[in-house]
Amino acid sequence: MERIKELRDLMSQSRTREILTKTTVDHMAIIKKYTSGRQEKNPALRMKWMMAMKYPITADKRIMEMIPERNEQGQTLWSKTNDAGSDRVMVSPLAVTWWNRNGPTTSAVHYPKIYKTYFEKVERLKHGTFGPVHFRNQVKIRRRVDINPGHADLSAKEAQDVIMEVVFPNEVGARILTSESQLTITKEKKEELQDCKISPLMVAYMLERELVRKTRFLPVAGGTSSVYIEVLHLTQGTCWEQMYTPGGEVRNDDVDQSLIIAARNIVRRATVSADPLASLLEMCHSTQIGGIRMVDILRQNPTEEQAVDICKAAMGLRISSSFSFGGFTFKRTSGSSVKREEEVLTGNLQTLKIRVHEGYEEFTMVGRRATAILRKATRRLIQLIVSGRDEQSIAEAIIVAMVFSQEDCMIKAVRGDLNFVNRANQRLNPMHQLLRHFQKDAKVLFQNWGIEPIDNVMGMIGILPDMTPSTEMSMRGVRVSKMGVDEYSSTERVVVSIDRFLRVRDQRGNVLLSPEEVSETQGTEKLTITYSSSMMWEVNGPESVLVNTYQWIIRNWETVKIQWSQNPTMLYNKMEFEPFQSLVPKAARGQYSGFVRTLFQQMRDVLGTFDTVQIIKLLPFAAAPPKQSRMQFSSLTVNVRGSGMRILVRGNSPVFNYNKATKRLTVLGKDAGALTEDPDEGTAGVESAVLRGFLILGKEDRRYGPALSINELSNLAKGEKANVLIGQGDVVLVMKRKRDSSILTDSQTATKRIRMAIN
């Protein structure tokens, strides 16, 4: 109470009031701001003020043993007086200098590993090239970009578990490392960071940079991959740009780029198969990108691209709620509509059934090279404001918007019949028919659209049907703007459904994506894409089909061998041999197949003529429907490298070359794998060892069922008989011994008996 009374007295004096009101800090609010709460309100000032004091730093008492009281110049490094309110020592900034010069040194080996992302950035900048600066208007649009080059693609939760496991392995708390990438990274980092003296918190921060994708919504004109974004401040201003070529690539950009290529290839291939959805899933599950399963990448990677989103939808993952049409991403920003089927007549009097959107709606349209704002009513374009990099890009956006508007004058501008088909030879839906038609030639569309005089609005000009700019006239409702339209910033994802023809719909039934929207652009992937599915072998051309077919036979040789001998028809019908047929000249397919099948039958009938290498070599030819003919061939032709190349029926050729010494097969000079068994060992060694405990009774006896592989023999009961397939593809009848005593003699007898049974 005393104090308050005293303050009241002070306040009653006019001088006090004058001091408090005339000086700058006159507001209780300001005094409060700087004195309440733990948060420092003016860190820079506080730092200057602290550093002006003699002992601004506090340290643990142990510092007194580690640092002398005075340095070589006799300046005091720490004060014996304790820090008020704690038992720490007051220390001078000079102590830091002393410590840096004379303190203990530690191994620097961990620094490049911990600060990996920084070291790599320095390298990229060192090797990057900066070109000239150009002054021009920059059309920047905000896009969601990756600002953190060189990261893995773990979710925040996954990364947190990895970081806890690496940095604080003994802390309590449930951590379940499930994904392959989590386990690999954890193992790698634990090894790298043994005996690391850097503070765990710092290590944790740096690991986070390496593991998690950080995105920001930034204005960009130009490259959007993370190695460009890290130098955004150097390459584009408001009215200037500087050319820049990065001095290195980072895996995350490569993953994004390769993922898009893989997804496009898979969607294109799935479209032409009997069951597109099933095929797409099979391919996604059997494909690897840079050694990581594609499905794992899809689950973690936020890339939004039409083909990638179709794959995600097929896997039941959520995707963005925007929809795609004509390669533009549409996001409705206001209004609503109901859909109704309507029949319309084209300029060629062809009837089209279109789903008309009734109601007023506004959309943003964002493409790679142009963006726009579209306002439309039922079958009417009210306003379109476009901005783009060049005339061509602007025209593309205008065509898409005009078709999307469903205006009558657009439909009447169609000349000729609409009969565009997709890769599977199915007719496209009417909206895509119209789109393709005008993408080929939009002259009539633009001429018939109509023009209007325009007002002079800042930053906007008109555009004429021949795509020239104008300040007086413009196509009806269409204007070109200097400013870009920002991409949709939200990262919200919605649940979608997908039908067997890969059309993706939201829960209201609106089509968001379909295979027609997948770009036909071909690119070369930065990371190796391994398509294990035979459906994808043809993606990389004939050579890839050839190599993959033979690799598949070698990988599955154990089962192929048994089928070859027991159930050849089933083997010949395997889908893995389908792509190969396109390499065999059409006229020769049936004859080759008949010839090879006859040859194989002779091998089965005449014991001892089984030839592993020859079977592998000729097997793919037997898959075509055979023509019966007496023709014999010494070589078979396959069409690769733009011409026919020969595979010799007996012996090696550049196409198919088996090296006896290394037991490896090369196809067109590419390694196709190794044969695990030796085709030339005869029947000694392996079989006699494996057949110990069995008595060989003679040639195959069909009454005892299909031939077992040597591995399956162990399931026989004592005294039971079975046919067994031995290494050279010959089948003999054996019986499991009743007594174990005579096992030793079996290996000698087996060798003799196999020879007799065969001969």
Curated annotation (Swiss-Prot):
One Pfam assignment: Flu_PB2_2nd
Main subcellular location of this protein, as a coarse class: virion
Keyword annotations of the record: Cap snatching, Eukaryotic host gene expression shutoff by virus, Eukaryotic host transcription shutoff by virus, Host gene expression shutoff by virus, Host mitochondrion, Host nucleus, Host-virus interaction, Inhibition of host innate immune response by virus, Inhibition of host MAVS by virus, Inhibition of host RLR pathway by virus, Inhibition of host RNA polymerase II by virus, mRNA capping, mRNA processing, Viral immunoevasion, Viral transcription, Virion
Compartment list: Virion; Host nucleus; Host mitochondrion
Gene Ontology annotations for the cellular component aspect, listed alphabetically: host cell mitochondrion; host cell nucleus; virion component
Disulfide bond annotation, renumbered to this chain: none
UniProt GO MF annotations: RNA binding; RNA-directed RNA polymerase activity
One GO term (biological process): symbiont-mediated suppression of host mRNA transcription via inhibition of RNA polymerase II activity
Annotated site (Mammalian adaptation): 627
Motif (Nuclear localization signal): 736-739
Domain of life: Viruses
Family named by the database record: Belongs to the influenza viruses PB2 family.
More about this protein: South Carolina isolate has been sequenced from formalid fixed-lung tissues of a 21-year-old male which died in 1918 at Ft. Jackson, SC. Brevig Mission isolate has been sequenced from lung tissues of an Inuit woman buried in the permafrost in a gravesite near Brevig Mission, Alaska. This sample was recovered by John Hultin, retired pathologist.
Described function: Plays an essential role in transcription initiation and cap-stealing mechanism, in which cellular capped pre-mRNAs are used to generate primers for viral transcription. Recognizes and binds the 7-methylguanosine-containing cap of the target pre-RNA which is subsequently cleaved after 10-13 nucleotides by the viral protein PA. Plays a role in the initiation of the viral genome replication and modulates the activity of the ribonucleoprotein (RNP) complex.
Quaternary structure note: Influenza RNA polymerase is composed of three subunits: PB1, PB2 and PA. Interacts (via N-terminus) with PB1 (via C-terminus). Interacts with nucleoprotein NP (via N-terminus). Interacts (via N-terminus) with host MAVS (via N-terminus); this interaction inhibits host innate immune response.
Entry protein name: Polymerase basic protein 2
